[in-house]
């Protein structure tokens, strides 16, 4: 049995801690056998191989009676780069617990569990449900609604440096003045409306109009504005900081991808790039 979990791109500019989309990079967890102890085989530096691994830790949180398993992990999702790697591990752990504990969890219950662990639904909801998802938390209950899937290619520019979410949050202000907060909220509200009505020209403009986090984080990811400038020249829909960064994500029509990549190269932007697409399925079990 293999659990296949997509990566995710979150915030989409002003949809801070609320909007996210599953994308076509994957974490795969293969169950090799029952064992006398938890063993997680992988080649990722500084990630535990025992029950302290986030996948196993999550599974045991959901189902403490889980029998020890020998697992093999294949991961294509860059860690600490704003592509939801921790949410993907958490989703895999929930699925592991649900399957072997015979819990019969619904997708909605899985989202509740994952969002409680994460603290917000922007990555975990699309990772579980697939597609583009808008979510929030009210009175410790998480709501998530799927929007239409955008018809674009995604180009993820992944700088060589990591940027942990906790470090990226340190640069955010503790408070926003009322005028800024209401303006930011109006931008986010209109972004949601444009995504659901598939008005992507408007959505692109709004994705690049955030006041909640990008103005404070752009100094941590200096490539953001450079890439956005190239993207505008190459007819892209929008460019934004994926999650907390350091990945910069661009929505673009497939016919313009080659020119965009060439433009990045000409501007000396030569870090790894991934050509991705929205993932509509979310977490899957492959028998």
Swiss-Prot record:
GO terms for biological process: threonine biosynthetic process. Its main location: cytoplasm. Transmembrane segments: none annotated. InterPro entries: GHMP_kinase_C_dom, GHMP_kinase_C_sf, GHMP_kinase_N_dom, GHMP_knse_ATP-bd_CS, Homoserine_kinase, Ribosomal_Su5_D2-typ_SF, Ribsml_uS5_D2-typ_fold_subgr. Keywords: Amino-acid biosynthesis, ATP-binding, Cytoplasm, Kinase, Nucleotide-binding, Threonine biosynthesis, Transferase. It catalyses: L-homoserine + ATP = O-phospho-L-homoserine + ADP + H(+). This is Homoserine kinase. The gene is thrB.
């Amino acid at each position: 049995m293999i659990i296949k979990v997509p990566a995710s791109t979150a915030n989409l500019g002003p949809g801070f801690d609320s909007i996210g989309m599953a994308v076509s990079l994957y974490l795969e967890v293969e169950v090799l056998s029952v064992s006398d102890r938890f063993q997680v085989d992988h080649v990722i530096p500084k990630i535990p191989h025992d029950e302290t691994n986030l996948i196993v830790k999550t599974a045991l949180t959901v189902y403490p009676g889980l029998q020890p398993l020998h697992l093999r992990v294949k991961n294509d999702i860059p860690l600490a780069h704003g592509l939801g790697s921790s949410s993907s591990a958490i989703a895999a752990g929930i699925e592991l617990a649900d399957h072997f504990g015979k819990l019969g969890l619904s997708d909605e219950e899985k989202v509740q569990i994952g969002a409680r662990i994460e603290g917000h639904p922007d990555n975990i909801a699309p990772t579980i449900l697939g597609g583009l998802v808008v979510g929030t938390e009210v009175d410790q209950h998480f709501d998530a609604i799927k929007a239409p899937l955008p018809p674009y290619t995604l180009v993820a520019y992944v700088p060589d440096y990591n940027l942990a979410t906790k470090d990226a949050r340190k640069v955010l202000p503790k408070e926003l003045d009322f005028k800024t907060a209401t303006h930011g909220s109006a931008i986010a509200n209109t972004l949601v409306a444009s995504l659901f009505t598939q008005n992507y020209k408007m959505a692109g403009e709004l994705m690049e109009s955030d006041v909640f986090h990008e103005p404070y984080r752009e100094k941590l990811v200096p490539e953001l504005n450079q890439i956005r400038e190239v993207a505008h020249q190459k007819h892209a829909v929008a460019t934004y900081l994926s999650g907390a960064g350091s990945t910069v994500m661009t929505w673009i029509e497939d016919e313009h991808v080659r020119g965009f990549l060439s433009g990045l190269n000409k501007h000396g932007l030569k870090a790894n790039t991934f050509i991705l697409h929205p993932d509509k399925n979310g977490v899957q079990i492959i028998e």
